[in-house]
Every structure is written in C-alpha cells, then in structure tokens.
C-alpha cells in the first residue's frame, strides 16, 4: 500500500498543532504529514519539532491570504508525490477583539470565503481516490444565524461556488457603506463569514460530484471542531463562548481526525458540516 500523504494548512497553534500527532499515529511512520506556517522558517521549525516528537512531518510555507498559495502548495505535492490523501484547511482570518466590522470584513471574507474556494479548487485535482478534503469551519456557519430573508442567498442546492462568494462580496460592500444592519446582517462579522465558508464548501462539493470531478470514494466536508480554548478564541471566552464549554485543542483535533480518517468505501457524510461525527444540518 502506498504511503499516505496528508497536509494540514495552518498547523502552528491550537487545533492545527494538535492534529499532526493524531494523524501520524493513525497513518504510520511511512506516511508524510505536511504542516504549514506563514513563513518557510516557521514551517521548517514546526516540522523539526514534530519530527522530534515522532511525527513524520515536513514543513511548507503557506498563507491563506495569499491568492497564489493554494495552487503553489498543491503543485509541490503533485510533483513530489503525485497526489494527496488528506487535506485539512485549518487556517483562517479570525475576528479581532476591539476591531470594527468595517475594518475586519474585507480581509476576513477575502481569506475565509475566497481563500477556502481557492483551496478546494487547487487540491481537488490532486486528491487521490478515497481522499478527504476538509475545511475547518464552525456552527456559526449554519443558516439559523442569519435572518430568514437572507438565507435564500445561500441556496447551496443550486448556487455555484462563485455565486456564494459574490453574496459575500455584497456583504462586505454593505458593511463598508454602512447599510449592513439595515439589510439584516448580524453585527458580528464572524457569523456571515462562517456562513459563507460553509456555503461555498457545500456548493463546491455538489459541483464536484455533478461535474464528475470527484475521485472515486473521495469526501469533501466542512468540520466544526466545537468551542475550543486557543489563542484565537481566548478574547471571546465569557462573551461569545462559555469557558465551561471549551475543549482543549487536542480534544477538538480528535473530531477532525475522525472525519479525515473515515475508512475507504465510506459514502457519507458528504458536503456537510460535521462536528465530532454528527452532521449539523445547514438549513436547520
């Protein structure tokens, strides 16, 4: 059996840092687990740390905010290995405490919505049969977090991925022009951002299957790790999140690994948002 190739996009901290050890233990010493950081030096440092911990890791630089990064990294994996078995997109632009939506909306949507679609488009062509392509998102991305009149804009049974991102661009324009509240968008930018991220993943998964672009047995899903205490969420504990509900990064990573390691021949879940093995219905 060929050695498994996995990549974790965004692996320096929190859940991303906890994932390599879990995947390494499951995939064995012959596997290659790529971990990314924003700079080459940080990626190599991370890979060295993981290697000392017994993880078969290699480092690559990757920044989700760089439009060229997904295609560049996918090209490297194609050249070195011919394909990839597991892709976990864990990187994201996180809301910043004390920063207004007008400042955060454009970079957040550019990264989380458009960046997610670039990852999906770049890595699907090199995904091996029975491969797993996972976008780490959140239950904040469920339609229940939007008012009813906005939900039809995210009809992932019909809309193309680019159409979803056009909706997100219109949201950014509304925020910057000061009309977002009147249009009914939530005050906190993370809700629309995550809805867009989950919706574009669902729309892309539907397209991939309908277009015959999906490798045999491959699965594309979004994943909700659940509330997790990390550097990115610490400022929101006690306000947005309940500290008593928070997991450790290691606990959250187990749920993501479970989705990534579903055995060959598994047909579902597909095109869903999954939290610790349970499908969270997008429209509920």
Task: Please place each PLM-identified region on the residue numbering.
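Short alpha-helical oligomerization interface
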Residues: 97-110
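C-terminal helical subdomain
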Residues: 118, 222, 230, 238-284
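Catalytic loop of short-chain dehydrogenase/reductase
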Residues: 100-101, 132-215
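Conserved glycine-rich Rossmann-like NAD(P)H-binding loop of the short-chain dehydrogenase/reductase
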Residues: 27-45
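Rossmann-fold scaffold of SDR-type NAD(P)-dependent oxidoreductases
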Residues: 9, 84-94, 132-138, 221-222
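Rossmann-fold cofactor-recognition segment
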Residues: 50-68
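Conserved glycine-rich cofactor-binding loop
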Residues: 12-13
